[in-house]
Amino acid sequence: MEEIENAHYQNLENFNDETSEDVNDTSDDINKNNDDNNKYDDNNVNVLDDKNKLENEEDNNNNDNMMIFSSILRYQRYKTKKGNIYFDFKNTNLSLNEKDMLVQSSNFYHLFDIKSLLCPHIYLNVSSHININISDYKNYLKRILNNDNVLDDKNENVKYSSCQEFIFEAVEQAEHIEVFTKVQIVKKLFLFLNQNVAEKMKNYIDNIPIINSNDYVLVQTNLKNDLLLGYVKGIKYNLFFEILNMKKCFHSFLNENIVIYEINEDKEGYFKTIDGKKYLKEQIVYEKKDLLKNLDFYSMYYCDYYFSSNSIIELEKKNNNNINCVNNNINSVNNNINSVDNNINNVDNNINSVNNNNNISDKITHKFEYNDYNDIHLFFSFNICIKSVKNNLFLHIIYNDNNLKNGDEYLNETFPHYEELNLYNKQFDINKMDKNLFKSNTFFINNLYYHLKCKLLCVFKFINMSDDDFMTDIHISQIKKRRYVNEQDSYMLYTFNIHTLSNEGMVYIFFCNLYISNMFKENNFEIRVHTYLHFQLNKQNSYKKLKLIKYSSKFLYSLCFKEKSDSKKKKKKNDHHERDSDNNNNDSNNNNYYNSNNNSNYCGSNNIIYGHDENFIFNSCDFNTLDQIKSGNYLIKDETINENFIFEVRNYKYTFILISSKCNIIIITLRKKKRKEEYNKKMSKYSSCSLNENVYMEGVEILNYCSSNNKNTNNIICNTIINKYNYEINNNIKNKNKSYILFEIVCFYENGEIQKYIYTCSLKNGNFEFFLNVKEDEKTKSINCKKCFFKPILFPFNEELLNKTKSSNDLVLYNIKLSHFKNLIYIYFQEKKIEGISLTINNECLIINYIKMVSKLLKKILQNLYNSDDIDIVYNFQHNTKNKCNYLSQNVNIPSDNTISNVIKKNEMDNNDIKYNLFTQREVKSSFFEFKYILFGFYDLFLMNQKNYTDLNEKKKEEYKKKNFINCFDSHSHYNFLNIIKEYINYDYIIDKCSYNISNDTQKKKKIKLNFYYFLLIIQYFKNTYTQEKKRSFFYMVYNELLQRDKYLKHFYYTYHEIDRKTNMHLNHNDNNIDTKEAKKNEETELILKNVNFYDNYELINIRKYDVILFCFLFHMYNFCLKQNGLSNDEFNSHITYFLINKKMKKYKKKYRYISKKKIDTNEKNDDNNNINVCDSKNYKGTKNFDDTTNNILNKQNESLDNLKKNMYLSKNNYDNQLSSYKNTKQNKTNINEKYNNNNIIMNYLTWKKCLYYIYKIKKYTRKIETHEGLYISSMLYINIYLCQIFFILLNILRINNTNIYTNIHFDIRKNNLDYFYLLILLNFYSLFYILISDQKYILHEEENDTYISKNIDNKEQMANDKNIISLLSFFNNIYEQNKEGMLKNDQNKNNHNTKTDILYMSSSGMNISINTPFLEKYLILIYNIIKDKINIVKEDNYIMEKLFFKINCMICNKVCVTNIYNNYYICENNHIFNKCMLTFGCIYKNHIILPTIYLLHDINDKLFPINNDHILSYNLQYELDYIYFCSFCYNFITTQNSFYKKFFLFNQCPFCNHELNIL
């Protein structure tokens, strides 16, 4: 990598030398100003000259619509101290100029220089950074808005003695930056400051890889320069460009006549009393118009920006004047830009937008002409923004469209996929997230050459606001579309409201109506605000933050009331309420969402269950099961309640305003009565806000005022978090008072302390009452920390903090006090979702969500197997699988001579051509993407913790090591699995049964080593002989529940779970009474399997035989790693912690490739092996006793399974009994604790029930998958690949496979801790790939093989036994013969060649022969065929998987470089390491993939190096790659340039884990 980087850098230096004059001509004066010396006064420049110069530079940029990059820049690190206030430029020779940009990233600052243009760079920790344009900021400090319109008294030059002094002031003045996630996918977008540079670089740009779609974000600064910057973060390139300059827009409005609403405080009071109830008094807004420059406001005050929680997208389709709302069904996306800016010549600027569900549409390449204007898709998108300056609020609309008649001169095509953007905007509210983290897109643009546009709508001027008062927080509600005011003129009405909070406690509520006429062509906006509400809090305090929580009375009643209600009536009202809450969805789409299956019972979003039939499993994945299982919190079908009471209650809307002051929190509860639509229409003449049901607040009643009354002035609140989805709820209080905890409030104080409050709702005499109480301290003392998205708290760690832990066990991070990382809780919740995700280290919340994710993945398999019309889809964007996927496989043509062409038919899967991907990443940002990173973050924290191990003395440590100590890379492996199962069956007896081909000699039996084949036999045997026992272990619970065999599984187990009879380990078929119909199905499936050419031993590794045992093991290991046996290896460094801990340690740079693994002591390793391979047999001393015991256990198995099934908590009849039994068990608390302690399990009752629920769902899903009616080979391939992908994801989340890239280069590749589960999944992948990829026309004839053997192979007998390897060598030989002459000319040692074996000799310098794509595909057929053959002989050669190696010549030293089937790297004799492609088994070197041959060890104990020359080729076959793909989830390198991959998989997703592939 260093060579590549240096090569690029040298070329770049030469280029920069040629163009240095052009680059630096416009910045000479500024370079002088930034010279780091004490002669600043002599080099000072006049302010007016700078201003004129800046204007001239802007004029030279052709027009204002040209976006400007800072550049594509390489970082250089500078020394910093804690607090980010110190800079040291002594080690650099750079000077600051207008092209430089300073970026602060956590504890590091990066200075970018234009001279390093297009060089690769590393950008660490982008989650929190400040973006400062140094020259702009400096010029701003000089000018301070000094222009004709805005006068400023301070017109002095700012002087700095050094650059450091300037940066001090810049950093102190800077605020955090708003960062938004991807808006649109960008391909090869580069803009340059200089036209000459662009012309000379255009040829180089064409070869730059495509930027990954996840790397596009928008950046908004809170600096006084008011910039909205676009930011594209790639692996190699960081792009900054200007999207919107708020300051320029603001100055453009100075001469406009704008609407000014004067807010004058009403002296008569804020309230009015009607019938004894207190209401907020409606106030009058005084409206006037005036020039903005005449408005008296203070520009020197700090300003801030607030945005609406959603954006609106409107669309007008071809030849249709009607505006269509954007629905949520995701379709394809496409946008192709064929025109570029005048300053960029011939640069490829294709922008392909890919939606969040991996949909890629066909390209539309027609060019736009003005006469085609009526045929294009017009779109209009906008968001509301408020700029707060002292006592003025400037209300802006920021919008974007593709209307070419409004001044945009660039070409435009069909706007990409509106539904996708609309879906993104609905999911997030950027104002509710920390400002230093990634945000959702608030703005989006169709074409990056189009600026966002801004329009000042009005100004709110607060007349009576005191000089010391100012706005501290503003909340803008969601923008909602109401109706057409005038359909002929396209006059549309949108409504929203604004809540403001001032420092002195004045709260204002404004109701705004936005009218937009002819939005696609004219963009005419009109804002109307007629009335507002306000009230005053205690002026003695200062108030900081304002947050809103809204509930309906119907929802509150469903939580608090204990009685039951009619489900059908409830369902109807609930659907109507949900449709009203989301205005952006059309009626037809909502009908599909809620009524896709009229015959099935619906599980509502308000904790309501309507049934448990078979269709229920499709509907019950995404509701709050925790609330559902609580007493009195569920509604059962066919039970009645007073309908009038429900109707009366649901007429109210409750709003809870949470206000935080210096030391206290205040909650104000408001209630408004909903008006009917007819009444709203009548009132529309008098008040514009009456049309908005959710905004209109006439008759707003104040119900309650609560305060925390904290008297401790030292507890200053720095932040508050509202957790609306609380896991821990006191059921006893609810049963007595019909009360319920609405939400939990967590106050974080500056001194590091935390205080929790709960806001309770109770129902008394038909009315709701609300209380704010202090939450009692929990026994676990868990800490809630809201860090939204996938940036964990791990990132602020550095060497200094970690070193401090040696003397102190406490760390203070983000004002959160942690101890040993044991009680860290990460809470992530999403708006309008019933259930939040609470992740912890030391209790069950984490394992529950882990199992929940498996349930969701299994549900996706069912959605692909069944017709979307037959199931009720929970996510509406998954509603139509055909629309989502059919274009992916429209052109899939399977060759006629394919071995499976007679079985796979087009449109076989219910007319849905589905690719072999589960779309795990691109759905909802909270479903899988962040979940993965959250798990990694917590796992890393836990790995660094020496749980209860550091406190032991030396003697106890030795005892602890011998008994319980497990190395971190052994705890996940199959060895620990054997430690689990040997508790239930005798290990020696297993070996005796499994190794049937070995004599019964005890001495020989002890020498048997575990291999992959024996491992498969063991887990088969364990699965068929494991029985229920009264053990309260997690593994026991999961296994027995998933293993329950009901009537649905008879056919499945009979067909697919046949085990080799030689081992006497077949299933007990006594209970599988199969009828005649099922027998016919069995015969049909057997014929299909024979015709499909499933090779001999595929049934041995079939993943569907091991799904139960895999699920159980993975769940258990996850629970095991996080709860019971904390990993005590402090030397293990994960992929995250490596960059945080070891960056200054030079000794790791050469010794390790990425991360080192702990060295294992030989004594310790031998002890572990002895413990594994030797197990005392107490219960099973002989074969007879063992068989008798096994028969007795099998006879009792079904009874125990039935009992467990009856006791499942989802059973409606036994739920109350279980709850009562739980209460009884509480009385015997001491006995329960003793029993739990004996089994190392301490579980909370509610979380245990919830965990059981998801395990139950997994069982239901697997039953449906296994009993799918379509027993065709295609369906089997789909199911098996999907299951492999699920298990592969789980394995990587757990890091069970320790064969990743974090390896020690001195580590023996054969001694790597092979996880046989990992190998089992990989072999399933490769076997299934072989079935898909096999094509007989590429297979070489046997005659060619024989000829090759006679000519080139000395040991003919041995090699002739493996014809597939000979076919591969013959393939190499044919290519060699075609390129032989060229190789001989270039070979310096050609005189030493052996004429007999031209290609089988060791050359002093390796040579590479390039091949094309057809040869690569032939190679894939051959290499997969060899792997298939090796799997077929696993019974005859039990160690074949350990003996199989891939080999090439090292590209550096020409030594032999090898890898095995399960490692993802190559290593040579000189410890040179190269990446390996897990799909083609090739070695990735630079921009090529080197194709290996197969090498088999004769004996597993033989030395790997050196390899005899007879097995070494003198050259490598290489294939040039356009791009190299890297999966950031499973750390595998994937090369996808072959037709096979394009046929059966999504091109930009990893086939193993479905994660999006990044381009290196």
Swiss-Prot record:
Principal cellular location given in the protein's record: membrane
Coiled coil residues, start to end: 36-60, 317-359, 1188-1239
A GO CC term attached to the entry: membrane
Membrane protein topology class: Multi-pass membrane protein
Chain spans, region Disordered: 1-46, 568-594
Compartment(s) of residence: Membrane
Biotech use, per record: Possible candidate for an effective malaria vaccine as determined by epitope response in sera.
UniProt KW keywords: Coiled coil, Membrane, Merozoite, Transmembrane, Transmembrane helix
Bias kind Low complexity: ranges: 583-594
Transmembrane segments: 1271-1291, 1314-1334
Positions with biased composition (Acidic residues): 15-28
Biased composition, class Basic and acidic residues, residue ranges: 29-46
Name by which UniProt lists this protein: Uncharacterized protein PF3D7_1223600
